[in-house]
């Protein structure tokens, strides 16, 4: 039976609590923005289907809790992930400094050579910005990973961040995705799915 998509990519949003991971996911998947902040407990996820280079790709995006007490829970979700969006808050120097720790968590728990994207969120707060774009870009370049500044509030680069991540994964996987099948429009499906597995059919 044709599942209606060519590839399934599992993505994880990681980073300190309060950097805006949930807002980025909601903006991308549902397109609302809320000023109210409720910390994620454990993990949450959404499904988003996109079109990329003529392929229908289902993104299973996991939003993880940034608090240290949840790290044991969330680290178990690292296995089988195809890509990580490592998020910090451009107005919070500590959240940027902790990026190295999050990258170590990826190295410890995820597959080797997994795709990563450094994301500086809350770029709309220009007067409160403390992490310079150039500094973050140079750090990302030194790791050989892409970097974007985003704003969940005004949607700047939000879609581009997830599309960049999907494109990087697809490029690393190379040709071989099955062609054909349905071509659904952008849609959200909150049906729970097994966290393991995925990849191109």
From Swiss-Prot:
EC number: 3.6.5.2
Presence of the UniProt keyword Disulfide bond in the record: no
Residue numbers with lipid attached (S-geranylgeranyl cysteine): 200-201
Residues involved in GTP binding: 15-23, 33-40, 63-67, 121-124, 151-153
Tagged with keyword Cytoplasm: yes
List of residues that carry (Microbial infection) O-(2-cholinephosphoryl)serine: 76
Localization, UniProt: Membrane; Cytoplasm
Recorded catalytic activity of this chain's protein: GTP + H2O = GDP + phosphate + H(+)
Any GO MF annotation of the entry: GTPase activity
Motif position, Effector region: 37-45
Pfam families assigned to the protein according to its UniProt record, in alphabetical order: Ras
Alphabetical list of InterPro entries matching this protein: P-loop_NTPase, Rab, Small_GTP-bd, Small_GTPase
Any single biological process term in GO: intracellular protein transport
Enzyme class: hydrolase
GO CC terms: cytoplasm; endomembrane system; membrane
Lipid bilayer topology: Lipid-anchor
Primary residence: membrane
Function: Protein transport. Probably involved in vesicular traffic.
UniProt record similarity statement: Belongs to the small GTPase superfamily. Rab family.
Protein name: Putative Ras-related protein Rab-1C
Species per Swiss-Prot/TrEMBL record: Homo sapiens
């Amino acid at each position: 039976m044709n599942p209606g998509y060519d590839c399934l990519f599992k993505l994880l949003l990681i980073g300190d609590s309060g950097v805006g991971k949930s807002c980025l996911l909601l903006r991308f998947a549902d397109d609302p923005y809320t000023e109210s902040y409720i910390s994620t407990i454990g993990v949450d996820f959404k499904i988003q289907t996109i079109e990329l280079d003529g392929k229908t790709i289902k993104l299973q995006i996991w939003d993880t809790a940034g608090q240290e007490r949840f790290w044991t829970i969330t680290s178990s979700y690292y296995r089988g992930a195809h890509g990580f969006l490592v998020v910090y808050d451009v107005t919070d120097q500590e959240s940027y400094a902790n990026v190295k720790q999050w990258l170590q968590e990826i190295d410890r728990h995820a597959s080797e050579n997994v795709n990563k994207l450094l994301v500086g969120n809350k770029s709309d707060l220009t007067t409160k910005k403390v992490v310079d774009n150039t500094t973050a870009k140079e750090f990302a370049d030194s790791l050989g990973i892409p970097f974007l500044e985003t704003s969940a509030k005004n949607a700047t680069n939000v879609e581009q961040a997830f599309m960049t991540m999907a494109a990087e994964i697809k490029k690393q996987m190379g040709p071989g995705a099955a062609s054909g099948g349905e071509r659904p429009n952008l849609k959200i499906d909150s049906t729970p799915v097994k966290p393991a597995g995925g990849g191109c059919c």
